[in-house]
């Protein structure tokens, strides 16, 4: 008898022996509907407790004009003792009220600034934006959408220094801190993003019935969870995130404490959570050279997602942009996608 010492061997054996309890396996619209109600309820249970809702008390603290777009730096309250700084980008010469899109950043110390293309003339910031084609908040604003680019907890202005833990992943440390209190950082960020939708909907420039979301990497994670639980999102773009927990969490370890809901794999794989967006339109972007989210796992997850949209009888609402690139925003289909559905 061989010794069972290795932890990774144990984890993978557990994964194979205990498939997710609510992994979608239906074919009919009726089966899809029942499954979706069950999984969304379970997901919300896992994400609780959410903070208590408080008045937004929003204020504008800065104005700037650049790239033919009006920028407002805004601050709004999402919970007790919690305020969110964000860039609001309002396109010039566009019919109002216009559709609004919350644009969510991924990992990195600059947070919202990259997505809004606010580089303060610094070369490091400019290179980070160019490398990932990161300024989709600006790109969408230049095409007629009002965009909101907020900082997540522990990023941008919401962290004294993202790198203060040395070689530790700051967002992982922050996630563990919330676990100590029986909270989880993914849920808290999702709550803040839901309040971001509240703020967008409150603006006179925005049509509250035409709201969307987009995010790259960790921003894609946020976009997925936001659209999964908040049906005000009428169209969602998940960029360079769709994968399997088996690949990116259990095999690669390419995740952190801010990127998952504790207990989720007991019930669902990544594509199942993404499937909660159905029947609403969903665009999945995947880079063929993305080492962090290998294309084989992305294709496996997308095939499962296709089965969910097919059962919901809305296959035409699931879009795919598999592009020849790495961990970055493609944009090849995103603008047509949002124009079609918002």
Description of each model-found segment:
Residues 1-70, 78:
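N-terminal targeting or regulatory segments adjacent to alpha/beta-hydrolase or S9 domains
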Residues 64-122:
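Glycine-rich active-site/cofactor-binding loop and its immediate structural neighborhood
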Residues 96, 104-191, 201-202, 248-251:
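Cap/lid segment of the alpha/beta-hydrolase catalytic domain
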Residues 173-180, 195, 234-274, 279, ...:
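Mobile cap/lid helix-loop segments that gate and shape the active-site cleft of serine hydrolases
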Residues 205-217:
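Alpha/beta-hydrolase fold nucleophile elbow
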Residues 215-227:
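Glycine-rich nucleophile elbow surrounding the catalytic serine of serine-hydrolase chemistry
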Residues 277, 284-286:
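Short beta-strand/loop motif that positions the catalytic acidic residue
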Residues 303-342:
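C-terminal catalytic histidine-bearing segment of alpha/beta-hydrolase fold enzymes
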